[in-house]
Every structure is written in C-alpha cells, then in structure tokens.
Regions:
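Active-site residues of response regulator receiver
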Residues: 56, 84
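Acidic catalytic/metal-coordinating carboxylates
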Residues: 37, 63-66
Length: 114
C-alpha cells in the first residue's frame, strides 16, 4: 500500500519538525513537504496529489481559511486538518464550516494528530 502523502504548513519550524518526527513513526505516512509559504504549497499541490494538509490558521501573508479554499479548488479530495493555538471552540467550528476535516489545538498533546 502506498503511504499517505502529507504537507505540514505551520509558521513555526519547530512545530513542523515535531509533527514530521511524530508522523515519521508510521510507515504508512510520508511527509512530502514542510513549509510556511503558501506559494510553495500551492505549486506542489498543482503538480502532485496529496492526501492530507496539516494547516495552521496563521501563516505569513495569508490565513489557513483562505488557503483551504485554494487547496480545495486545486485538489478537492485532499483532506485538511487545522492545527492552531487559537481558541478551540470558535475556530474549530469555523474550520469545519469552511470545509476542514478536523481541528486539533496546539494546546493539546500533539499525539492527538497521530
């Protein structure tokens, strides 16, 4: 079985690295890109199919909600998991209404992603 391809988008390099290490424990998951740059991610998505994007709400030059719309316009079946330090209740609801498949608070254990 082909591993699930994952893009990690977060403004903090340490968060990107931590998620990659955590996901790297599972041989059925392959992190194909780690970035905080929306243009880099969009270029990648235009070229390669991606199963999941782990997406922060706050990114340099854009926000996760705007980027979610762009991602879905390129790859409608790509799943989106929001990861944010924002207030869980308000932003979780907004994320799901915007089309995300899930929401994880950074204030919780990152093992919730795994």
């Amino acid at each position: 079985m082909k591993p699930a391809s994952v893009i990690i988008m977060d403004e903090h390099p340490i968060v990107r690295m931590s998620i990659e290490v955590l996901l790297g424990k599972n041989s059925n998951i392959q992190v194909v890109l780690k970035t905080d740059d929306s243009r880099t991610a969009i270029e990648y998505l235009r070229t390669y199919p991606v199963d999941l994007v782990i997406l922060d709400i706050e990114l340099p030059g854009t926000d996760g909600f705007t980027l979610l719309k762009r991602i879905k316009s390129i790859q409608e079946h790509t799943r989106i998991l929001f990861l944010s330090s924002k207030s869980e209740a308000f932003y979780a609801g907004r994320a799901i209404r915007a089309g995300a498949n899930g929401f994880v608070s950074k204030r919780k254990d990152l093992n919730d992603i795994y």
